Amino acid sequence: PANEIKKLFNSDNKVTLFQSAIGPQKKNVEMHVSKRKDSSSILPIGNRQASIFPGTEESHKEKIKIGPLNQFLSKKDFKKQVFVKIDVQGYELDVLKGCEDLIHLFDFIYVECSFIELYEGQVLAHEIIEYLNIRSFILDGIYNTYHDKSGIAVQSDFLFKKI
């Protein structure tokens, strides 16, 4: 996916790409690469993920760089309203922790969260809601809820607004 994103934004001088993941500490980690491009994660892919979303099993692992957001951007880089989208397959809380020094500059955070564990060790939606509430973000909307075959809510997109 990184090469596709590079091609997409290659000629846009308003876009700067950093080939790194966001997390609380600077380090190298293994990415569990899924057979489907949209299901890879730093966390191991769980059995429920593979059963609810067939074809998302792990195909291989890759080493990637990870670090806090302030390693790539500073306060001066945020000039207007800031909208942050997080869709990281179970690693949401660690991404938010990696944004800790700059999160007060965000106006909106749009994050995909799960109601059940799909990736080993992931936090669930209620934990993300609590984390952001403590940091003065309120839940402003819930979108795109996916239900499994039995009707159980699996995951949704959550929009948080700074108060």
Roles of regions detected by a PLM:
Residues 72-163:
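Conserved acidic-Pro-Pro-aromatic motif
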Residues 18-20, 63-66, 85:
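Conserved residues in the N-terminal Rossmann fold of short-chain dehydrogenase/reductase
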